[in-house]
Amino acid sequence: MKLSTVLLSAGLASTTLAQFSNSTSASSTDVTSSSSISTSSGSVTITSSEAPESDNGTSTAAPTETSTEAPTTAIPTNGTSTEAPTTAIPTNGTSTEAPTDTTTEAPTTALPTNGTSTEAPTDTTTEAPTTGLPTNGTTSAFPPTTSLPPSNTTTTPPYNPSTDYTTDYTVVTEYTTYCPEPTTFTTNGKTYTVTEPTTLTITDCPCTIEKPTTTSTTEYTVVTEYTTYCPEPTTFTTNGKTYTVTEPTTLTITDCPCTIEKSEAPESSVPVTESKGTTTKETGVTTKQTTANPSLTVSTVVPVSSSASSHSVVINSNGANVVVPGALGLAGVAMLFL
């Protein structure tokens, strides 16, 4: 009961002081809004500041009430040293003090372990047991291996240049042969023999012809009489010596036997007639060689006469004879180049 009386008296005192402060600020024009009430334990202090002269008492600012807490009033204690309790102003259900932000930790609840350990399991590496293989009385755990020969073996004979050979195969679309000598060739298992100029058609193509390597030879013809025509020089070689004839003369060659080299062109098929009546046809690249008879080794150059020759001789103003050859002359010139 006594405590309730003290609290009620303190509330009335604080209300009176608030009204007194408000009336003082409203009635006086010399007091500014900077008046403040400082409360302490058992005392009330009112501080006022005069307005400056320049205001002329025209300050319209409303006084600011800076104290929101109720002052504490000392109650006579009847000779006791009991301090007056602090009375809080009702806040109409609101708190004027800032709430204290307290962090509430979640309670830690231990889970039932059912007889197991709650600690994290330790990762341990378990090595596989090593099992020793039976050695059967030997020092090695594995039986000895036996070397076996390969299942498929091939034997390569050593290279022998005298017996080994290679065959060159050429695929051709045209094949040319020269007569009168027969030409034989084999293609696709068939053998063909050509004895005269003809066109041979092979239907089972593609065909491959085996072509042997040929060696060319040189044909030599022995003559007993040799005819040349002037004024063009005639040059020939026999027994390693070269002779040049520039005018009609008789040339005797003593170092017999003598041979004259004659080359043939495989493209020409014109018979070549010599002075002794021998007729030959070309045989491709194949030539023959004949040795001369020592008794027939004289080569004679016959002078040109207008009665015995079909040539016509024209006198040139430059001093040179111009020869117009006839048929016999062409044959003789052809014989020189053969």
From Swiss-Prot:
<keyword id="KW-0732">Signal</keyword>
<feature type="glycosylation site" description="N-linked (GlcNAc...) asparagine">
    <location>
        <position position="56"/>
    </location>
</feature>
<keyword id="KW-0677">Repeat</keyword>
<dbReference type="GO" id="GO:0000002">
    <property type="term" value="P:mitochondrial genome maintenance"/>
</dbReference>
<keyword id="KW-0964">Secreted</keyword>
<feature type="signal peptide">
    <location>
        <begin position="1"/>
        <end position="18"/>
    </location>
</feature>
<dbReference type="GO" id="GO:0009277">
    <property type="term" value="C:fungal-type cell wall"/>
</dbReference>
<feature type="compositionally biased region" description="Low complexity">
    <location>
        <begin position="20"/>
        <end position="49"/>
    </location>
</feature>
<feature type="lipid moiety-binding region" description="GPI-anchor amidated asparagine">
    <location>
        <position position="318"/>
    </location>
</feature>
<dbReference type="GO" id="GO:0005840">
    <property type="term" value="C:ribosome"/>
</dbReference>
<dbReference type="GO" id="GO:0005199">
    <property type="term" value="F:structural constituent of cell wall"/>
</dbReference>
<feature type="glycosylation site" description="N-linked (GlcNAc...) asparagine">
    <location>
        <position position="22"/>
    </location>
</feature>
<feature type="repeat" description="1-7">
    <location>
        <begin position="124"/>
        <end position="137"/>
    </location>
</feature>
<feature type="glycosylation site" description="N-linked (GlcNAc...) asparagine">
    <location>
        <position position="152"/>
    </location>
</feature>
<feature type="region of interest" description="7 X approximate tandem repeats">
    <location>
        <begin position="58"/>
        <end position="137"/>
    </location>
</feature>
<feature type="repeat" description="1-4">
    <location>
        <begin position="94"/>
        <end position="101"/>
    </location>
</feature>
<feature type="repeat" description="1-1">
    <location>
        <begin position="58"/>
        <end position="65"/>
    </location>
</feature>
<feature type="repeat" description="2-2">
    <location>
        <begin position="220"/>
        <end position="262"/>
    </location>
</feature>
<protein>
    <recommendedName>
        <fullName>Cell wall protein SED1</fullName>
    </recommendedName>
</protein>
<dbReference type="GO" id="GO:0031505">
    <property type="term" value="P:fungal-type cell wall organization"/>
</dbReference>
<comment type="function">
    <text>Component of the cell wall. Major cell wall protein in stationary phase cells. Required to stabilize the cell wall in the absence of multiple GPI-anchored mannoproteins.</text>
</comment>
<feature type="glycosylation site" description="N-linked (GlcNAc...) asparagine">
    <location>
        <position position="136"/>
    </location>
</feature>
<dbReference type="InterPro" id="IPR038843">
    <property type="entry name" value="Sed1/Spi1"/>
</dbReference>
<feature type="compositionally biased region" description="Polar residues">
    <location>
        <begin position="75"/>
        <end position="93"/>
    </location>
</feature>
<feature type="repeat" description="1-3">
    <location>
        <begin position="80"/>
        <end position="93"/>
    </location>
</feature>
<feature type="region of interest" description="Disordered">
    <location>
        <begin position="264"/>
        <end position="289"/>
    </location>
</feature>
<feature type="propeptide" description="Removed in mature form">
    <location>
        <begin position="319"/>
        <end position="338"/>
    </location>
</feature>
<keyword id="KW-0134">Cell wall</keyword>
<feature type="glycosylation site" description="N-linked (GlcNAc...) asparagine">
    <location>
        <position position="114"/>
    </location>
</feature>
<keyword id="KW-0449">Lipoprotein</keyword>
<keyword id="KW-0472">Membrane</keyword>
<feature type="compositionally biased region" description="Low complexity">
    <location>
        <begin position="272"/>
        <end position="289"/>
    </location>
</feature>
<feature type="repeat" description="1-5">
    <location>
        <begin position="102"/>
        <end position="115"/>
    </location>
</feature>
<feature type="region of interest" description="2 X 43 AA repeats">
    <location>
        <begin position="169"/>
        <end position="262"/>
    </location>
</feature>
<feature type="region of interest" description="Disordered">
    <location>
        <begin position="20"/>
        <end position="165"/>
    </location>
</feature>
<feature type="glycosylation site" description="N-linked (GlcNAc...) asparagine">
    <location>
        <position position="78"/>
    </location>
</feature>
<dbReference type="GO" id="GO:0005576">
    <property type="term" value="C:extracellular region"/>
</dbReference>
<feature type="compositionally biased region" description="Low complexity">
    <location>
        <begin position="58"/>
        <end position="74"/>
    </location>
</feature>
<keyword id="KW-0325">Glycoprotein</keyword>
<keyword id="KW-0336">GPI-anchor</keyword>
<feature type="repeat" description="1-6">
    <location>
        <begin position="116"/>
        <end position="123"/>
    </location>
</feature>
<comment type="similarity">
    <text>Belongs to the SED1 family.</text>
</comment>
